[in-house]
Every structure is written in structure tokens, then in C-alpha cells.
Amino acid sequence: MAVSKEDILGAIADMSVMDLVELIEAMEEKFGVTAAAAVAAAPAAAGGDAAAAEEQTEFDVVLSSFGDKKVGVIKAVREVTGLGLKEAKELVESAPAPVKEGATKDEAEEIKKKIEEAGGTAELK
């Protein structure tokens, strides 16, 4: 018997955030694709260089490593993401991993600072 789309959607709806991250990574590997949103290329206007010179407004905070203070980094990740202990631990152990995506510059820098104060290393993308 084939699995229906509704069954798949129901199973996905019941997954935790970390399970979804693992599912996406497995699908990327299996099918050789990325989960990045497709962006349509717009024709360049007369001031095309001006758009390239605009400052980035959204940042992704990526945990590079947790160093030798894993417990402190897990606490910092829980504080900034609101994840449960298990999910935060899985996120930290899967480094490099995104902690926060689409954050403002100030928010991203604050999250990076908290992770680094806890003993981990993070970068902004």
C-alpha cells in the first residue's frame, strides 16, 4: 500500500524542529538538492551597482563549534532559541548548525556574543 501525501504531511507536522532539520539534511543528501528558496534573477536596473552596495539586513547565526564548554553553549542556545534541552543539545552536537536565521544585525550580533561568552564559536552569514 502506498503512503498518501496526507500521511506524509501528518508525520511531518508531528516532528520536532531537530527531526525536521535531520529530515531536510537527509533529503538534500539523497536527492542532491538544497533547501534554499529559489530566487528569480531580476533584470539589472541602470543603478545595478547600488543594489549590490546595499547593506545586508538579515543575518543567519551559525554555531561553528562548541569548544570544550558544551554545557554552557547548550544553555546559551536554549536561551536564544527557546528550544528544549534535548533539541538544544542535538543542535549543538550537530555543529556547524544554524542557530537563528533571518535575524536583524543587532540580534545576530547579540546571539553570537552569548554563544562566544559561553565558550562556543559562531559566525554571521
UniProtKB/Swiss-Prot annotation:
The keyword Transferase is assigned to this record: no
Task: Enumerate the InterPro entries for this protein.
Answer: Ribosomal_bL12, Ribosomal_bL12_C, Ribosomal_bL12_C/ClpS-like, Ribosomal_bL12_oligo, Ribosomal_bL12_oligo_N_sf
- Show the segment(s) annotated as Disordered: 96-125
| CDD domains assigned to the protein according to its UniProt record, in alphabetical order | Ribosomal_L7_L12
Q: Name one Pfam family in it.
A: Ribosomal_L12
| PANTHER family on file | 39S RIBOSOMAL PROTEIN L12 (PTHR45987), LARGE RIBOSOMAL SUBUNIT PROTEIN BL12M (PTHR45987:SF4)
This one is known as Large ribosomal subunit protein bL12
